[in-house]
Amino acid sequence: MEINKEEVEQRFRRSRISYNDNARVQKMVVNRMIPMILSSVKRVPEKILEIGCGTGLLTSQLQRTFSSDGLYLNDLVEELCYHAATVNRVSLTHCFPGDVEKLFLPLSFDLIASASTFQWFTTPEETFKKLSKRLEQRGVLVFSTFGKFNLREIRLTTGGGLDYRNKEEL
């Protein structure tokens, strides 16, 4: 499955103003992720990396839940990364904008979290390996993604939609 990252970046950049107004599914995902994260971590994470922070939907929940000065953000769209940091009072020096598949991550983390981002990876297996190397000894990776049958009804009705991987392809 070929992903055009430039196109993905352009589309998210263009929709950044109206994104939160239309992100009903993403908001539901974030609300379900926090309890999953809490049940997965054994201690309060000191260093947290959010991949694909976008407008900051998950960022705000992570900040509220863990009140962490060790929250680091990544997004493919540089402006979104800095916007999410500013809105959520995260140090701008904690932003790693760009394609996480290509970025060098200089730190290790207790928690790596991502909501609705991994479906955009071009090399998911390599990226999982890379991220696992950036986890502390008891670190946890928690993510959500869209799958092959996401919004199937829209595809059947309109003949259009996005192609996502099935779980075996991740």
Specify the residue positions occupied by each region the protein language model found.
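A structural alpha-helix within SAM-dependent methyltransferase catalytic domains
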Residues: 34, 63, 128-132
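A short acidic, Gly/Pro-enriched loop at the edge of an enzyme's catalytic core
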Residues: 101-112
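A short glycine-rich, Lys/Arg-flanked "PGG" loop and its adjoining helix->strand segment in the class I
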Residues: 125-140
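Conserved alpha-helix/loop element of class I SAM-dependent methyltransferases that forms part
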Residues: 24-44
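Conserved catalytic/acceptor-binding region of the Class I
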Residues: 140-170
